Structure formats: C-alpha cells, structure tokens
Amino acid sequence: VVTMAGGQGTRLGHTGPKGTFKLDVYGKGKYLFEILIENLKEANKKYDTVIPWYIMTSKENNKETTDFLEKNNYFGYDRDHVTIFMQSELPLVDTEGKLLISKELKIKEASDGNGGTYSSLRASGCLADMKEKGIKWVFIGGVDNCLVKMVDPVLMGVAIDKQVTVACKSVVKANPKEKVGVFCKRNGKPNVIEYTEITDEMAESTDENGELLYGESHILCNLFSVGAIERMGANPL
C-alpha cells in the first residue's frame, strides 16, 4: 500500500500535514493517519499477514510527518513494515511560463504532485524493495480519504480477470458542478481531467439517457501492478 501524504492540511483548516488532521469519529477524535492504520491492521488480521506500507511525504512536511508518527508509535503498526520516502520537486513557473527565482537567486521548486509518485517510488528504492519482497500489486491512495478500502481483493480480482495492469475505482458525480476530477478518454486512452480544467459545457453534457458524459469521478483509489509502476516511473509524466 502506498499513501500519498505530501500535502499540507490548508484546505481542511489545518496547519500541519494532512495526515495529522483530527476528525470526530463517533464522538472520539482520530487522526487521518490513525484511521488508515486501523484499516490496515484489520486487513492484516483478516489475511494473516503484515502489509508493507509506503508513505510518500514532501520536503515541506517530511520531518513533521515522521516526528508525528514516531511520537504516536505508528499507532501500533509494525515499524519494520513502514517506509517513508519523499516525493521529488519541480521548478515553479509563473502564468507566462517564466521561472520563479527566490531572494537567494535560486530557482523556486515545489513538490511534483501525484504524477511524481511513480518516479519517486523508483528513485527512493521503494520499487526495488517491493520487487525484492515479491509484491505484485500496489494500491495507491491519498491520506485524506478516510473511507478508502486500501486492501480490496475484489478490485484486484477484477484487474486480474480483465488482464489489465491498472484499475481505478469511481463514484458517480453528485451533480455537474461537483469539484472532482473525472475519467475521460484523451486520444483514445483513459485519462483524468481535473475539475479546474473541465469546461461548463463538458461538465453538463449528457448522453441519450440523460446521464453525465463526464460523470465518473476519480476518487484516488487506484491499483497498479508493480510492472506498471516500473514503466511509468521510467518515463516522465
């Protein structure tokens, strides 16, 4: 399991890393990391194993995330099966495509986002570690989805049955204006278009049955074969 946890909790009204945000769960405060760990521990018990967990942080929040998990003793998860790695960074540009320069006359950089996960897994040695452990399938999701089912044999079974190397879960959009990325085809290939990029006309388009043409939302629940991660990590996205 790979959890993308490089972001800050700004949009949640939280000053720290997203994973350190606390929710009210049945009257009890629980951190996002804590909830995910509980789900992993349940899967470990069900399948009589200990699932290797890879947490992707960023240069911005790596220390704070690591300190938080250490302080809380990884909420009881076996530390030997947790690997923390940092995602890469890319140069920042303005709206005209010009590089942004800091006061120290250095090129400003920021984390390269979800698309950099694959190359970061490769560069950090995590991909090699997965192969050494004999791992065949990897679930990749975001730290802020507390309802995610990180270990889903049905999703894996569908991928194997359909002979595909990538499988994604989707939820139908509540309405055309819902702020979620949606699945589409670009040049005949599966793709995701973000809500910030889709036009109103596209968002509101329907088929002959009145269903949204772009109604399958991308909820960041993705399953990859190790081979697929290796291929994508070797090619710039």
PLM regions: where:
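Domain-scale recognition of functional cores that engage charged ligands
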Residues: 1-3, 10-237
